[in-house]
Amino acid sequence: MAPRIEAQEIETYWNIFSARTNGSKFLTGEQAAPVLKNSGLRDDQLERVWDLADVDNDGNLDFEEFCVAMRVIFDILNGEHADVPSTLPDWLVPESKAHLVQANRALTGKQVQFERVDDDPDSPGLKDGFDWYMSPADKSKYESIYQENRDMRGEVSFGALEDLYESLDVPDTDIRSAWNLINPSAGPTINKDACLAFLHILNYRHEGYRIPRTVPASLRASFERNKIDYQVDKQAASRWATKADDETSTGRKAKFGDQYLTRLGRGSFKTSGTDFSSAQTDSEWEEVRLKKQLAELDAKMASVEADAERRKGGKRDSKPALVKRELEQLLDYKRKQLREIEEGKTKGQGGGSLKGIQDDLQTVREQTDGLASHLRSRQQHLEELRRQIEDEKAGR
């Protein structure tokens, strides 16, 4: 199975990114430097990591590029790479920037060569030029078909679309070829992203284009990790600007699935807009702010320890006690938040689900436990410093 960035890993990167950008969509070199340097890599290595991750060469890192940089660093630290790789692995290339990577490889002579497949003599009259780009109108139609045929797990089987196949001018062999192309694991069902790609291939074949025989490496990795990012801000080819005509191939393409959707009563399907259900909640933002506060407290403690080390035998500094009080106050505050949530005193947004409240409770519990553990560790360290100071005094 191809490597991938797990959802938990992406969430960790998001917490770091959002805490540094303060609401901005980009991370500057100055903002990223402290995070990257904490890895312990040499400056020349970090420079090469930055060059790899900054795919669009704008001098900043957006969130996708920041994820790339962090994953490359962790792979080096974990021994996956002996040094910074000269090029990004295909599975790590952000789908929205794949065309930039391909263009750069072409200019530098490192273009990836895909297998060339000769024209199929059994398919005379078909056209070349299949395009993986989905126009917004096509994508909306694909999503409508998906919504009507998905199972309770959000997946679609090959047989669920039998009625659609009958309405298309596509041979059964080509339909199965398209299914196998987007289902490399040969599973009985495919998820939403793979289903959209499957319908897109059938759409092109319905218009008279050949079924693609191979998939670009970066896109193939996206199929394998069941996550595809379809960007609709790409410049469309000139043929999309022509007026639809039922007698032209473009007109036939526009009619893909219309008859099928009409039978389902979904001919006037409209998208409802972007789904922001996965947006960051207040508790998640609070977790980000808390982590930032803990980092600041750690820095204060490190400063106190350094002062104590320099002063060995001198007057005991009062800062450790102050830091301890700050940690205790922060811990008490989080415990109070937890009690309020459990008693139903917090003001949540209307319509919140029980699972969302349970997730918030679990997050606060984890924060509280982490703070308690951190406080105990700091107290032990503080006691050790005090013993060292007392030993120094006694030794004089």
Swiss-Prot record:
Region Disordered: start and end of each range?
Answer: 341-396
Spell out the InterPro entries in the cross-references: EF-hand-dom_pair, EF_Hand_1_Ca_BS, EF_hand_dom, EH_dom, End3
Q: Can you list the GO cellular component terms from the UniProt entry?
A: actin cortical patch; endosome membrane; plasma membrane
Q: Which residues form the EF-hand domain?
A: 41-76
Q: Topology versus the membrane, per the UniProt entry?
A: Peripheral membrane protein
Q: Which residues form the EH domain?
A: 9-99, 138-226
- Residue positions binding Ca(2+): 54, 56, 58, 60, 65
Q: Its principal location? A: membrane
- Composition bias, kind Basic and acidic residues: at what positions? 380-396
Instruction: Write out the annotated subcellular location.
Output: Cell membrane; Endosome membrane; Cytoplasm, Cytoskeleton, Actin patch
Sorted UniProt keywords: Actin-binding, Calcium, Cell membrane, Coiled coil, Cytoplasm, Cytoskeleton, Endocytosis, Endosome, Membrane, Metal-binding, Repeat
Q: Which GO terms describe its molecular function?
A: actin binding; calcium ion binding
Biological process per Gene Ontology, one example term: endosomal transport
Which parts pass through the membrane?
none
Q: One matching Pfam family, short form?
A: EH
Q: Does the keyword Methyltransferase apply?
A: no
Q: What's the domain of life for this entry?
A: Eukaryota
Q: Which residues form a coiled coil?
A: 282-395
On subunit structure and binding partners, the annotation says: Component of the PAN1 actin cytoskeleton-regulatory complex.
Q: What does this protein do?
A: Component of the PAN1 actin cytoskeleton-regulatory complex required for the internalization of endosomes during actin-coupled endocytosis. The complex links the site of endocytosis to the cell membrane-associated actin cytoskeleton. Mediates uptake of external molecules and vacuolar degradation of plasma membrane proteins. Plays a role in the proper organization of the cell membrane-associated actin cytoskeleton and promotes its destabilization.
Family the UniProt entry places it in: Belongs to the END3 family.
Q: What is this protein called?
A: Actin cytoskeleton-regulatory complex protein END3
Q: Origin organism of this chain? A: Pyricularia oryzae (strain 70-15 / ATCC MYA-4617 / FGSC 8958) (Rice blast fungus)
